[in-house]
Every structure is written in structure tokens, then in C-alpha cells.
């Protein structure tokens, strides 16, 4: 039973981090962020990860290292049944950000501490 590490995005840039740790029975994503740019018109490319943003596979949880947008910016793309984990401060800031950008109906208290 081996441990696998997959970097989905973030090896050739600052920001837009998404990595995954998995075994034969468990899959955990670490961060799901937006890419960074100095261009004010830049829009981060949607990050599509099978089992996380669609139903082609499964994911047990997503762990957020901290609340910066380059680590949490694509949180709302994560399937709602996947558990989200973050520290107390990160959770609070992520909920405030979700309410600001999407309204309270999308900002569910899904994060666990």
C-alpha cells in the first residue's frame, strides 16, 4: 500500500496551488486556489479535477493550508458532498469571502476544524 502525491497545479507559477495525497483507499486534496497575476483583467483558469469538481471518481476531503485566494479561490467548484477542512480563522475568512462573492445561499458552513 503506497502513498502517492500528485501536483495538479502550482509547479510553474506562484499561486493556483492544488496537490493531492492518495492511497489505495483514501484521496485528499490540499488547497484549491486561483492563479495569481499582476494583470487586472486576468481571470484564473477553472481547475477541473476528476472526483473533486465532477463525479468522475471520488475524493474524501479537501484540506486548506490557509485562507489566501491562491489556496482557496476555487473552493466553490468543489462538489458539495466533499468534506472541507480548515483552521478556525481560515474557515471564517472563507465564509466571509463566499458571502461577498456569491451571496449567503452559496456560503454554507461546510468546513470542519
What are these regions (language model features)?
Residues 66-74:
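Hydrophobic alpha-helical bundles that form the membrane domains of multi-pass transporters
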Residues 13-16, 25-64, 76-77, 81-82, ...:
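Pre-active-site segment of Zn-dependent metallo-hydrolases
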Residues 1-4:
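Extreme N-terminal starter segment of soluble prokaryotic enzymes
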Residues 9-11:
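Short Gly/Pro-enriched turn/cap motifs at secondary-structure boundaries
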Residues 13, 69-70, 113:
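Short acidic loop-to-helix transition motifs that present clustered carboxylates
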Residues 20-22:
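Short, well-ordered beta-strand micro-motif
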Amino acid at each position: 500500500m503506497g502513498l502517492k502525491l500528485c501536483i495538479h497545479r502550482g509547479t510553474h507559477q506562484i499561486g493556483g496551488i492544488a496537490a493531492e495525497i492518495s492511497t489505495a483507499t483514501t484521496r485528499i486534496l490540499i488547497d484549491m486556489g486561483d492563479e495569481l497575476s499582476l494583470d487586472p483583467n486576468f481571470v484564473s483558469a477553472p481547475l477541473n479535477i476528476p472526483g473533486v469538481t465532477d463525479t468522475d471518481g471520488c475524493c474524501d476531503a479537501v484540506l486548506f493550508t490557509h485562507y489566501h485566494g491562491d489556496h482557496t479561490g476555487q473552493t466553490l467548484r468543489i462538489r458539495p458532498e466533499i468534506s472541507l477542512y480548515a483552521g478556525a480563522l481560515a474557515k471564517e475568512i472563507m465564509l466571509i469571502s463566499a458571502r461577498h462573492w456569491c451571496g449567503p445561499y452559496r456560503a454554507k458552513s461546510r468546513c470542519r476544524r
